[in-house]
Swiss-Prot record:
Keywords: Cell inner membrane, Cell membrane, Ion transport, Membrane, Potassium, Potassium transport, Symport, Transmembrane, Transmembrane helix, Transport. The keyword Ribonucleoprotein does not apply. It holds the Pfam family K_trans_C. It catalyses: K(+)(in) + H(+)(in) = K(+)(out) + H(+)(out). It comes from the Bacteria. PANTHER family: LOW AFFINITY POTASSIUM TRANSPORT SYSTEM PROTEIN KUP, OSMOTIC STRESS POTASSIUM TRANSPORTER. Belongs to the HAK/KUP transporter (TC 2.A.72) family. Its main location: membrane. GO terms for cellular component: plasma membrane. The chain crosses the membrane at residues 41-61, 82-102, 130-150, 163-183, 194-214, 235-255, 276-296, 309-329, 366-386, 395-415, 426-446, 450-470. It is a multi-pass membrane protein. This is Probable potassium transport system protein Kup. The lineage of its organism: Bacteria, Pseudomonadati, Pseudomonadota, Alphaproteobacteria, Hyphomicrobiales. InterPro entries: K+_transporter, K_trans_C, K_trans_N, Kup.
Length: 651
């Protein structure tokens, strides 16, 4: 026995040393400095980044055991094999792949699938559509994850009621629906005030996870033998068919790992990595090994081991804490969905959406009504349709494994094109990640009939919408460009036949500064007047998240009547044209909002059989265009200074 204890002590020391080595490797090239204290950032990361993966122990181990059981019977080797798989999956996927590699692929400090796509496209000549397509698929899978996470998380917490009081079982689904409806209803109020307590609550949650697991490890300390990969390999090889299905359930322990990268811009790399290595990872392992030891010594407890191993006096507090943790996890995913939607709009992957800022101090705190409504409806429908978290498990895995697979593909391009790694160095690493990702993805894709269809259906609809918008805007641009007249030609004609000059400044928005804006053409045609000063304004979205105010505006004088202005925003920034034009004062143009009129073109689109797209896609694009947020609101232009001129375009 003393030999075992000494061995465990050595393992613990080795784990701490490994943590130090990993942290040192993760920060080998770290140079960022944070204004806030590290402790505050780590605590914040616990509340935002790790809510999803932190609530996985409620259902992940249970689902993996159900998959591993043969005729409802679990052998000791099965239990050790499953917990060993979870340990090594968390180590290889989260600690190695995400902590050591993916978190390095930041786009000016920002992370997430669309940030990575923008980074990679910017590094490739011609910005190939293939990369855009991969990014769109990744974004669609992320939204699928955002729908499933609140549903499965809150449902799994509510299922704890079945242990506390079996007579409350019929109220599990209604209670989950009430909590979720309330959660989505209060989004418009902002999360600034309640977010302060997210970190402490999740810190308490991880302490509870670790403590409950550590207590039950002593039920059967030999469970720690599962740290040896032998048990994982043996489980995979003895019964490959059963193991393959089990791998799909084991992946549930990794759901939420993508949040480490998605929330990179909120906290920075160092706090996220430290929170994982020193708090989240150890507490998760203690809980999973504790559940395994509990089942080894209480074989009948495999139904809901997470709650069954909690002492009766602590059951109600644990159910309440689990509910709070799953709500926080859901909130983090909802906030992430807003952020990704805003990025997609800025990158012209989605139509303009109404974006409301819920905080005067923190610009990142936003609320998108349409996204909130659609997300809330989809989540409630899933809860009512699937009723149990076990039924949602299959749908969950496909969305997250697909997202991770896309991340790996883009990471390879970042390694070879941005980090300038040799292929011989990058390829072995990426192939290792791809083997793991493909194993998890294939193990989940076979569950289409069990609920995976929901994930695939959500992602397919979103890919269709985003790709239709991308294709449609391109066709519309090409169509209108053919009909437009070069600005040079219009200026020459006005020099020969000067129109009536009226006082003030006119700003014409256009996507192509070389062509005369449609609004300008119609103004000259119908009113025969030209303002004293005319600005041809182009708004550009950069491939990086933030553009400094000093780099916001470029101004060039075309002639005495015309000026060309280009405003550049990052894809994480909300365009504010009046404020940006105010920056032009230092460039020599004294912008005055009270003497300026903004001329916008409002296009009425008609479907055409010669558009280059199928007729159904034309109609879908027109529908999306009609639902787009008003340009005046999106660009934050005062409505009293706007003149809209309508045109009809056949696409």
């Amino acid at each position: 026995m003393s030999g075992e204890l000494n061995g465990n002590d050595t393992s613990a020391q080795a784990a701490v040393s490994a943590g130090s080595v990993l942290e040192g490797a993760a920060f080998a090239d770290e140079g960022e400095q944070h204004n806030e204290s590290m402790k505050t950032l780590v605590l914040g990361a616990l509340g935002v980044v790790y809510g999803d993966i932190g609530t996985s122990p409620i259902y992940a181990f249970r689902e993996a055991l159900h998959a591993a059981a043969t005729n409802g019977i679990l052998a000791r080797s099965d239990i050790l094999g499953v917990v060993s798989l979870i340990f090594w999956a968390l180590t290889l996927v989260v600690t190695v792949k995400y902590v050591l590699f993916v978190l390095r692929a930041d786009n000016n400090g920002e992370g997430g699938i669309l940030s990575l796509m923008a980074l990679v496209r910017g590094a490739l000549k011609g910005r190939p559509d293939l990369i855009l397509g991969v990014g769109i698929c990744g974004a669609a899978l992320f939204f699928g994850d955002a729908v499933i996470t609140p549903a499965i998380s809150v449902l799994s917490a509510m299922e704890g009621l079945e242990i506390v009081a079996p007579n409350l079982t019929p109220f599990v689904v209604p209670a989950a629906v009430v909590i979720l409806v309330t959660l989505f209803s209060v989004q418009k109020l902002g999360t600034g005030r309640v977010a302060i307590v997210f970190g402490p609550i999740m810190a308490l949650w991880f302490v509870a996870l670790g403590a409950s697991g550590l207590w039950h490890i002593f039920d059967d300390p030999t469970v720690m033998a599962a740290l040896n990969p032998y048990y994982a390999v043996r489980f995979l090889t003895v019964s490959p068919a059963v193991a393959f299905v089990t791998v799909g359930a084991v992946f549930l322990a990794m759901t939420g790992a993508e949040a480490l990268y998605a929330d990179l811009g909120h906290f920075g790399r160092k706090p996220i990595v430290r929170a994982w290595l020193w708090i989240v990872f150890p507490c998760l392992l203690l809980n999973y090994f504790g559940q395994a030891a509990f089942i080894l010594s209480h074989g009948e407890a495999a139904a809901l081991p997470f709650f069954q191993m909690i002492p009766s006096f602590a059951l109600w507090p644990m159910v309440l804490l689990a509910t709070a943790a799953t709500v926080i996890a859901s909130q983090a995913v909802i906030t992430g969905a807003y952020s990704v939607a805003r990025q997609a709009v800025q990158l012209n992957i989605l139509p303009r959406l109404e974006i409301q800022h819920t905080s005067e101090k923190l610009h990142g705190q936003i609320y998108i009504p349409r996204v909130n409504l659609l997300l809330g409806l989809a989540v409630v429908i899933l809860v009512l349709g699937f009723e149990k978290s076990s039924n949602l498990a299959a749908a969950y895995g496909i969305a997250v494994t697909g997202n991770m697979l896309v991340t790996t593909v883009l990471l390879y391009i970042a390694m070879t094109r941005i980090w300038n790694w040799r292929v011989s160095r990058a390829l072995p690493i990426i192939l290792g990640f791809l083997v793991i990702d493909m194993l998890f993805f294939s193990a989940n894709i076979i569950k289409v009939h069990e609920g995976g269809w929901a994930s695939i259906g959500i992602a397919t609809v979103l890919v269709l919408i985003m790709w239709t918008w991308v294709r449609g805007t391109r066709h519309l641009f090409q169509k209108t460009r053919k009909a437009e007249v070069p600005l040079d030609l219009i200026v020459e004609q006005m020099a020969k036949r000067p129109p009536t000059i009226v006082p003030g400044t006119a700003v014409f928005l256009t996507g192509d500064p070389k062509s005369a804006p449609t609004a300008l053409m119609h103004s000259l045609k119908h009113y025969k007047v030209l303002h004293e000063n005319n600005v041809i304004l182009t708004v550009v979205t950069a491939s990086k998240p933030w553009v400094a105010s000093a780099d916001r505006a470029r101004v060039s004088q075309y002639n005495e009547r015309f000026m060309l202005v280009t405003l550049t925003f990052g894809y994480m920034q909300q365009p504010n044209i009046p404020r940006a034009l105010g920056l032009c004062r230092r460039l020599g143009w004294k912008f005055d909002i009270m003497t300026t009129s903004f001329f916008l073109s409002r296009r009425s689109l008609k479907a055409s059989v010669h558009s280059g797209m199928p007729l159904w896609q034309d109609k879908l694009f027109i529908l999306l265009a009609r639902t787009a947020s008003d340009a005046t609101e999106y660009f934050q232009i005062p409505t009293g200074r706007v003149v809209e001129i309508g045109t009809q375009v056949n696409i």
